Amino acid sequence: MPLNKSNIREYKLVVVGGGGVGKSALTIQLTQSHFVDEYDPTIEDSYRKQVVIDDEVSILDILDTAGQEEYSAMREQYMRNGEGFLLVYSITSKSSLDELMTYYQQILRVKDTDYVPIVVVGNKSDLENEKQVSYQDGLNMAKQMNAPFLETSAKQAINVEEAFYTLARLVRDEGGKYNKTLTENDNSKQTSQDTKGSGANSVPRNSGGHRKMSNAANGKNVNSSTTVVNARNASIESKTGLAGNQATNGKTQTDRTNIDNSTGQAGQANAQSANTVNNRVNNNSKAGQVSNAKQARKQQAAPGGNTSEASKSGSGGCCIIS
């Protein structure tokens, strides 16, 4: 099958790093097969090279960027357009390694994603006597970025092709895998939205540590809810006890009132009974007095009665003269 532009995959690769770490030397060694010894600060250079990667003809479109801070305003534009990034530091400069994290975070922010094809490169491996950064330090930095790591020498052409080819493979392979991951995440988000609000049946979208945290948070909510419920129950019990005490006090007061009323009524009844007895005594006394008076009058009237009888006899026409 004849080659044409439509059959050739093109990779847009960007070389990023601090000033003087050998970005241009690596790019020129790859594209022109020679080493540039003198340092000429780059503003921005673009290189193209046709290569064969895994039996596939490809074109590497490489952007060599400026490492100086005064050109930092240009970074976002090439970060936005790049597909893969070669993050380069010099093994003779510890600060150049530390700078890589700043570039990495800026790339993620500009690309608005949590994955970008990246290869971390420790250049100038031929200057072993001036080494400030160990292989392990470089590897640890690459692990933080979830990226492959290589030490290279642009001067001796060590691992130069391998660094660029590895980056192209990441763009080719991880790009498709990453798109698949995005699709799966979108489906997972939709499933999460569908199950949202289903209470205990809801399952967190993420697993592992996120699930554990969700459970811990749920446990915290449960304890909090239990505390609130207990507080409410305590409040209800307190109010119920208060009402009970008030009812008891009310009943006691009512009983006392009833007792007082009963006592008063009994007193009144006793008083009335006493009055009745007194009245009866008085009546009896009066009756006795009347009876005695009548008896006395009868006794007094007895002699007078005989005289009267005699008078009645004399008045019948018979008169006795003494």
From Swiss-Prot:
CDD domains: H_N_K_Ras_like. The S.cerevisiae Ras proteins modulate the activity of the adenylate cyclase catalytic subunit and therefore affect the biosynthesis of cyclic-AMP. GTP binds at residues 20-25, 36-42, 66-67, 123-126, 153-155. There is a cross-link at K131 (Glycyl lysine isopeptide (Lys-Gly) (interchain with G-Cter in ubiquitin)). RAS2 is necessary for a normal response to nutrient limitations, in general, disruption of the RAS2 locus results in an overall premature starvation response. Present with 19800 molecules/cell in log phase SD medium. Alternates between an inactive form bound to GDP and an active form bound to GTP. Activated by guanine nucleotide-exchange factor (GEF) CDC25 and inactivated by GTPase-activating proteins (GAPs) IRA1 and IRA2. It catalyses: GTP + H2O = GDP + phosphate + H(+). This is Ras-like protein 2. It comes from the Eukaryota. Its main location: membrane. Pfam families: Ras (PF00071). A lipid is attached at C319 (S-farnesyl cysteine). A lipid is attached at C318 (S-palmitoyl cysteine). The gene is RAS2.
